[in-house]
Amino acid sequence: AFNMAFVPMFAKKVEGGEDAKGFARDAFSGLAGVLLIFSLIGTLAMPWLVWAMASGFAGDARFDLAVLFGRISFSYILFISLVALLSGVLNTFGRFTEASFVPVLMNLMFIAAMLLAARADWDMGLTLAWTVPLTGIAQLAFTWFSARRQGFTLLPGWPRWTPDLKRLLIIAGPA
């Protein structure tokens, strides 16, 4: 939903010769900040979230396992959301291959993790749970370097609360 609001605004800035880099940087930083807080809250609230979604697990080992796996993997939402924003930047410049490779990278990492876990006799569930955030980091690094090659080096920082960023939040906020 955020990207559905971001991409048209970003594309308009690119076409109009406006400060597209500044807008992208502010959107990246703002999204990263909000999602970092959201990820921390979600991780801390994981027992409640598991209970709300799988109350049948309460009172047995599945509950604790679901909480553990949820806490490990919840940060993926931060990484994949930033990947989506960077993919929107790339798509605006007609660079579709990089963004379309992101899910392939996830599949490759999961296959590699399962093979490694089987060979090393690791716990498969924990291996796959840890593969989720590691995959998010790899996907973010891949799209970040792709955007950098396109001339967009977006580093987290304090976003400037410009009228455009406020408009973006108003449009994307309800979703």
Q: At which residue positions do the language-model features occur?
A:
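Membrane-embedded alpha-helical bundles of multi-pass transporters/translocases
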Residues: 1-175
